[in-house]
Amino acid sequence: MLPVEVPLSQLGPPVLLLQLLLPPTSAFFPNIWSLLAAPGSITHQDLTEEAALNVTLELFLEQPPPGRPHLHLEDYRGRTLLADDIFAAYFGSGFSSRRFRAALGEVSRANAAQDFLPASKSNPDLHFDAERLVQGRTRLEGALRETLVAARALEYTLARQRLGAALHALQDFYSHSNWVELGERQPHPHLLWPRRELWSLAQVGDPTCSDCEGLSCPGNMMNLTMLTSGYFGTNPPKPPGKCSHGGRFDQSSSQPPRGGINKDSTSPSFSPHHRLHLQAAEVALLASIEALSLLRSRLGTRGFSRLLDITPASSLSFVLDTTGSMGEEINAAKIQARRIVEQRQGSPMEPVSYILVPFHDPGFGPVFTTSDPDSFWQKLTEIHALGGGDEPEMCLSALELALLHTPPLSDIFVFTDASPKDAFLTNRVESLTRERRCRVTFLVTEDPSRAQGRGRREALSPSRFEPYEAIALASGGEVIFTKDQHIRDVAAVVGESMAGLVTLPLEPPIFTPGEPCVFAVDSLLSKVTVRMHGDISGFWIKSPAGLSQGPEEGIGPLGHTRRFGQFWTVTMTDPPQTGSWEIQVAAEGTPRVRVQAQTSLDFLFHFGISAEDGPHPGLYPLTQPVAGLQTQLLVEVTGLVSRQKLGDGQPQFSHAVLRRVSEGTHLGRVSLEPVGPPERGLLAASLPPTLLSVSVPFSLELVGQDVGGQCLRRSAPQPCSVAPVLLELSGPPDFLTPGSKAPLSLRVASFSGPQDVDLRSSVNPSFSLTSNLSRARLGLNESAWGCLWLEVPDSAAPDTVVTVTVTVTAVGQGASQVPPTHAFLQLLVLAQSSKDQLEDPTHSAAPVLPPTTPALLPSTLVTRGRAGRGTTGKTWWGTVGGVLFLLGCTSW
């Protein structure tokens, strides 16, 4: 552990935990994947996660769990904090830290992205570079204010993005300035107080550094008592006598005075003041804890817990058709919602938030979001079936609205008896479900093969529900067809799906009537349930011991069978026998079979590409791989045993299996290599080039063994897809204001061959949005750039979240086989003067989060040039930036 040089008696309660943290081999490079370049360094990701764990443990210590033993600080002294450990101690062993770790991943990736995004990586204000310390503090306070406003509006994805940006700037202050060189070992007492001066800032004519010829520059600073920071690159140019940032990526470090002062890593090749790296990291960690504690004081414990998803529970999100024929369905939704509220209120599984979006042709919405179950119930009771009833309805528009306001890793339930009128949104909604990692289940009280139905103007096609099928497949959900008399019973899947279940992979993955399918049950699974629906005439389930159970309702030798029309569930008796189970179904057509279970062992994942040409080396996160671009699969296993039990062994995943979704054919098997300490559960693998050569959806399954040697299999809830092009969308570093005009930068690049593409953009709400790039012809490894201008009307309401969507569609021969690519960007509208501004520190105990003035980016012309070095030799870097599917916001 790193020593703390400040007496513990001088620190506040959050800082008392510091001795427990910061493993010496874990800030300053972007993420842990940077450590290949500088082993032993502490990264932005480390600092962010450790600070969040500190504040979370403090929260757990102050808020004892109802009906459970209190946590004691002494139990964690001398140990590295692990999310799985403290969650198990607080909530119990059956509750997963997966959502919390996913939220931390969102913040950490948003933090790291500041070093990669075109709009932020070279902006000195966002990194406290070039002696722009006052401007840097203004941007820092603005990002914290955005975090606060977005969290209060229940827009947690946006709040985590802005929190990551704020923490990056805060941590950079201690690595890029000379605060540590001045002998300071505590955070700057005025940095989060905007009405207090930073004091003793070096002026334009003050020399700050002397020349340093070598890589390591321990004595290159002048005898200063003034605060300064280094210049990076050529914008702005370094004045005579000033310090450089330093390191191999800094062009200014070769100009006198040579060298630099950054403490980003332990490597002199990157950090001339590498010897002060650990000291800078200690202070940056203290400052990060201080900032998170500030947010907790402003949001309250409940609001802060939702910001970081310090809960095993998910959100409850309904999309309701309110046309005249939907009376039974609406009542079923109300019954399930009431049951969930009553059963879970006050428990760890109480929903984090409640979302409701009605639709009724020709309209949809508005969206209703709340964290108060009573308010949600009141709103739900006001929903009634209205007049009308013509097929089809604006279902996908309502679903898109729900996706934009539902937290990641949530289930969304759509109740309807109509096909979609807005089927043209199918691809965009599919992409949004993957980006938000939300699972969509459609409960449809309409037989797709039935020609009759509710009122309609023309004959209905049996394929009219295919958009629902496509979205359910892309999101990992399902479409359940039922009838009015069964909807209340079938709707019980709402409560069951919200229990944090995992879906077990079937072998073969594509079900064939009359042929058995196999699924593996390991020792970490409980409450195994088989769900089947379709035109089923019979089924048989066989255990590893050879016991069988058929379609007879009631309790059988293996579990409890229930039937509601053509919807069947079989809940296995706990504990289920470990080993290989078989299912065989007799049905007309293709039955739908899903096996789910409860477990604490699961995984999160995202993709990444190596970044070598930015300010720092690292692995840049993507939500999906890009065709032709060398990509890493990055896995984070959740629910591993604590360090105290490692001697007894732990489950291990050895490889990942990739399959084509439509046919289930084998696409490849890749070995998973551990990264860092085993208790962190981090794994990585290189995706095979054959997978990245075409844009096809594929499933991801991890395979390994549990502690007893039984086969261990976990599958990603959603299929993955390979994007045909890399699409970047990035905005200004600040918030929007009413009456402003903000430029957004756009880039599209191809790595799989020449492509002609069309680009379309839209914005919600309907503000004015113009673009100077509507079509591009791309060669191999070429990019096209453009600019969008977003005009915010004077009448725009403060605290409004604006979502910009860009869609790239291939044109020309074979274009119909190439799926569209979408990018989503969320921005926040704030008033210049806000109610969130607090009083001066002399009248308040908390730091102030004041308004800031956004600085607009210069106009970007449409140009074309080389995207990078290609996909062979050195790993490509050059066009990645901005937002790819709301880039790096979530991990499943």
From Swiss-Prot:
Keyword list (alphabetical) reads: Glycoprotein, Secreted, Signal
The main location class comes to secreted
Residue numbers spanned by region Disordered: 231-272
Secreted recorded as keyword:
yes
Q: Which segment of the chain is annotated as a signal peptide?
A: 1-27
| InterPro entries in alphabetical order | GBD_Hemicentin/VWA7 (IPR056475), HMCN1-like_VWA (IPR056861), VWA7 (IPR052577), VWA7_N (IPR056862), vWFA_dom_sf (IPR036465)
A GO CC annotation recorded here is:
extracellular region
User: Which Gene3D superfamilies does the record match to this protein?
Assistant: von Willebrand factor, type A domain
Q: Does the UniProt entry include the keyword Glycoprotein?
A: yes
Q: Name one Pfam family in it.
A: Ig_VWA7
* Top-level taxon of origin: Eukaryota
Subcellular location as annotated:
Secreted
Instruction: Spell out where the chain is glycosylated.
Output: N54
Q: What is this protein called?
A: von Willebrand factor A domain-containing protein 7
